[in-house]
From Swiss-Prot:
It holds the Pfam family Proton_antipo_M. Keywords: Chloroplast, Membrane, NAD, NADP, Plastid, Plastoquinone, Quinone, Thylakoid, Translocase, Transmembrane, Transmembrane helix, Transport. This is NAD(P)H-quinone oxidoreductase subunit 2 A, chloroplastic. It comes from Jasminum nudiflorum. The keyword Plastid applies. The gene is ndhB1.
Amino acid sequence: MIWHVQNENFILDSTRIFMKAFHLLLFDGSLIFPECILIFGLILLLMIDSTSDQKDLPWFYFISSTSLVMSITALLFRWREEPMISFSGNFQTNNFNEIFQFLILLCSTLCIPLSVEYIECTEMAITEFLLFVLTATLGGMFLCGANDLITIFVAPECFSFCSYLLSGYTKKDVRSNEATMKYLLMGGASSSILVHAFSWLYGSSGGEIELQEIVNGLINTQMYNSPGISIALLFITVGIGFKLSPAPSHQWTPDVYEGSPTPVVAFLSVTSKVAASASATRIFDIPFYFSSNEWHLLLEILAILSMILGNIIAITQTSMKRMLAYSSIGQIGYVIIGIIVGDSNDGYASMITYMLFYISMNLGTFACIVLFGLRTGTDNIRDYAGLYTKDPFLALSLALCLLSLGGLPPLAGFFGKLYLFRCGWQAGLYSLVLIGLLTSVVSIYYYLKIIKLLMTGRNQEITPHVRNYRRSPLRSNNSIELSMIVCVIASTIPGISMNPIIAIAQDTLF
């Protein structure tokens, strides 16, 4: 009789577990359908690579690109749906998160064509490269929708591990190994700091891990103004600062940019910032709702340091990738203005609009650098002298992207900064906006210095690299140029039609 009762209880428990798993798979699983498409693409790549003796490179690229495009399509089809919380509160789906997921997918879709010829020339393992890119994209997407402390920690670690492996992908390159080691050590330290901050939040809120429940827990425990919350805020700012790479958390950025393969740098330069920005807005806005003045002050300091140091140090650089590294530090200072403004005065809409333009400007610049590097084997700024005489199309494309990064009208970068600064001014961030304007002028100086080198036609200034410049005969070259053309167009034309883009961002968010 006892055995019969125990058997019935076991059957009932098993049925409940099965029904709960079925519910998660059927209902919650549909909320991460774009992510499931990427997972299916990853599995398909692994199966083909492990079962096929011949490596059909175009087929691998097709599977990766198709997975990303299908994921974007699935994301667009569920646009403007009601916000949903799934997986027992671990994941949230809403318009704000989906915009950042769209930006990450867009970055990865544009980055894969940049890597085609580079991988063929350097004879890198193609399957592993694409697997790391897709897995990092998946981690970034989960980070955008993370709704509890555990997911907020695990998702960026998924992205970070793939980033470490990608940065050290050229194992025979000493600079790449050095960059990977610095990246790994500083990334591990920042993750430890972030976990320590989460422990303070967890304890102060009475054992809560969901973001909104942490706020309720802090109210119940009356700990929202306690020293523990201040410590958590400080450590979270340091931990997230590593992902965003503002000054003074920028030490790893120039070395990783210079030592890593150029397509990898292009990927990391945009996806990491998009994912970290999405995470920062949610963490600062929700758990630290009662400490808004404190985190506003911290971010203002980071923004000022980033805009000043990033743009001033960029002037002295001789490597294109190091120059873009310091330029990206300055650019993240502008993005932080939008984070500080927040929901009021269209702060988030201006930040998202500028990030969309920054993706096209930055990836367009890196596409030009990849092409030039493959055809000349150099990354030195002086070696670009006279490029216009050999390849006017590449020189003009690079010039347009650099001018857009500098914020010259009527390019997209100008209108993106104008919208961002206007929102900051309306929110009363006068000092930040003035510093942003001054440092933008500084950035225009070093961008114009490069453009002057590109357009020079005097033989004594043309280096042997440009004098012996030859177009690549590889058919895959078209993929890089296609990505470059898309980015150049996106860096110029959207500036003319700015209002519809702003209207879409505002209508989606609010």
